[in-house]
């Protein structure tokens, strides 16, 4: 698949806000319902660091296969090139920050 610079049109979330956006680094806040997810994808250049504010997240990762559950206050980083899927593992909305950098942002969706 081809890398995309803006992935906001590819999947629905309850809310998306950017708190910091500068060359090579950004901080986004996302809120997803229990039925929403961020589909399988990877980034060529940036690491994703997730920080849960409310609710709970479940991350599925490949290479190697791994499953991570995060509660409020917990973090997890996904290295560039590692495929991952982000889901809400709770019964209410989940809100989290994702710190993305250092490098040029891209999003490579998988089918």
Describe the residue ranges of each PLM region:
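Short acidic-glycine-tyrosine-enriched beta hairpin
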Residues: 64-80
């Amino acid at each position: 698949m081809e890398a995309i610079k803006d992935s906001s049109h590819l999947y629905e979330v309850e809310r998306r806000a950017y708190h910091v956006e500068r060359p090579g680094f950004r901080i986004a806040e996302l809120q997803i319902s229990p039925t929403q997810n961020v589909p399988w994808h990877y980034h060529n250049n940036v690491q994703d660091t997730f920080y849960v504010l409310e609710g709970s997240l479940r991350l599925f990762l490949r290479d190697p296969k791994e499953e991570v559950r995060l509660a409020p206050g917990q973090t997890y980083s996904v290295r560039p090139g590692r495929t991952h899927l982000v889901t809400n593992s709770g019964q209410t909305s989940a809100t989290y920050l994702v710190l993305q950098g250092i490098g040029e942002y891209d999003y490579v969706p998988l089918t």
